[in-house]
Amino acid sequence: MGIREDWNDKILIFDGGMGSLLQGAGLKPGELPETWNIKHPEVLVKIHEDYLNAGANIILSNTFGANRLKYNETAEFNLDEIVDAAMKNARTAVEHCGRGYVALDLGPTGRLLKPMGDLDFEEAVSIYTEVVKAGVRGGADLILIETMSDTYELKAAVLAAKENSDLPIFATTIFDGKGKLLTGGTPKSVVALLEGLGVDALGINCGLGPVQMKPIVEELLRYASIPVVVNPNAGLPRSEGGKTVYDIDPPEFVEEMKGMLEMGVSAVGGCCGTTPEHIRLLAEMCKGRTRKPIEPKNDTLITSYASVVEMGTDPVIIGERINPTGKSKFKQALRDHNLEYILREAITQQENGAAVLDVNVGLPEIDEVAMMREVVQELQAVTELPLQIDTTDTEAMEQALRIYNGKALINSVNGKQEVMDAVFPLVKHYGGTVVALTIDEEGIPATADGRMAIARKICAEAEKYGIQKKDIVIDALCMTISSEPTGALVTLETVRRVRQELGCNTILGVSNISFGLPQREIVNSNFFTMAMQSGLTAAIINPNSAAMMRSYYSYRALAALDEHCGDYIEQAARLAIPKAGVGGASGAGAAGSAGSGAPAAGAAGASGSADIGSQASGPEHQLTVSVERGLKEQAASAAGELLKTMDSLTVINSCMIPALDKVGKGFEAGTVFLPQLLMSAEAAKSAFEVIKNQMESSGEAGEKKDKIVLATVKGDIHDIGKNIVKVLLENYSYDVLDLGKDVAPESIVEETIKNHVRLVGLSALMTTTVPSMEETIKQLRKEAPWAKVMVGGAVLTQEYADMIGADAYCRDAMASVNYAQQVLV
């Protein structure tokens, strides 16, 4: 009997921490924990047995850091040897105890994926595939993907597990105290992604204790329709005598976990700092308990890496402008591979009110598959809005869905059997919400009854694949009233009936209604209002159209979707709407915080589009805006123009630094996410390169700032955080000496002394490597007492940083920049 069959109404119990027990058994600072699978197998077998005897149902293989990046041809042991030994040790413990399941443990690679980092998505899938195959060969009963801080890497690991095994897949992520992943994801976005990918259970582990996890767990349970797993740390860490200890004892830990079960959690265990005693008391508490029934949720969620759009009562605006149909400039941009043009269209639509962006790059003379894949990646680097993948080419659709970081809206499927046969397997494999067109082999029915019949057929076929109605959005189809006088009425009737009879969400390409008519925006905007009143939940429109956006905000105010008419008032102020008529300003500004489908606050003025690319704005403004929005080519071009009339330092201090500061403050406030922060830094870097070349050719003296040493400490290969800090510090003109990862204390001290560095930054992700960080600080205090030390990493807190002797705890990259500005004066 497998774990799926055995679970039923049981509460599953995972084991607890591994690293702290290995430290207690003699693991040295900087020593790789996975090597003990081979060097000290008896220790691993004993730890596994202790957890099983304590009452754990599931033990984790000691493979958290096992991947080819760490165990390559230069390592003491290769990857297969490490995983084979780990699985053998775990299986031996299960045989000795006569019970239990072995989970193949997959941890993060320690690298950021492109476009934020340098690791290709398919390479990440390949890295995890190697471990999965070895784990399956070694007898794993399930796969646990844990401690993931990036939804993109999480997706790569899940795909590797799905495509190379039929084992149950559990996936847990590591959130910060504000309920965010490193790359900006929320519990809601994680649930949408993982349920779409079809994992068996999802949850949270590490980083926080059970008290700090509670609000995050509540959010996971609010949206999850599958079991939720919670594996907290034993509270918050501190250092005592060179070892990491935690502030919650086993009885207190179990009392907090009791509350988790009452909330509806289905599986519990421990992470850093928990021991067999924690698990023993946890198992005793769980005796006689059954897990609460899981209530299926009916939320239609579309996500990016960070943002979630929920379809329902509040209409969703889908920007239509990234589409070559009828757009000669867009077609030429595709032919010329001018991606910046496409990115500007995206940013303009976001600022003018779009909540989702349609992406269509179909042009006969280009490679649509390659272009779609590239455009999706580039768009996700500059905007956090979810995307609608719009293509009839199933290969392009699959490539886009595979590379997409989130749960996409897919446009589209229809009632033709061959189309359903091609599209539904992709929706099932990659997850997504699919637009369903009410057309089949016979064409578009002239009646609402005919379109409803197709909608029902599509829903029935989708059910065969396990695709629920909540992930189907019905398009009732707009027929132009110039040729079909009753077309609008049929469409509106179909929209109403879909909502009432099927309970599905609805979508329309609104502007089709007016094709061939004069003053189309008048017809479009009035039909848009009628459609929203009929139950339309999403509209593909031009958000740069003032008439359409006025209809949108007016409807929301009238339908009591806009509390105190706040969004309408803000939008009216942006546009200075005349008292009568639809004339006047041609733009549309986004309004402030609204319902789940309403756009986020924007900054476009009455011109109807952002200032990007505007001939009216000068190069100074262009440079500032380009840096803020991560447009590399435009930033470089604007910098070059400014240097014709301005000296280099003025360009840097008047344009570049204020823009970086603005983005940094947005990141600290949670309104800007990590990909945007990094792309802003990349845009600044491209402008700096132009400025640097100008300075070298003219002999102009540049601004020199202090050297800073950065390193990930001995034994730790996870240098994502350190690399992010490096990018930002360099953009603030600091000279960063990046020593890399797995760096010995002696090497850090040597570089600090040799360059008389006044600030050292140390990073660690794993609890087992924090003692190495503490040792590094001790050596710096002795050999380079003038140097300040800032520390960061998922396992650290302010108290912990104080205890190991650091001068500053920096919770994120901007905090590191701020501290550098304080001490390096």
Task: Tell where the protein language model's regions lie, with residue ranges.
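Domain-level signal for soluble alpha/beta catalytic cores
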Residues: 1-475, 479-825
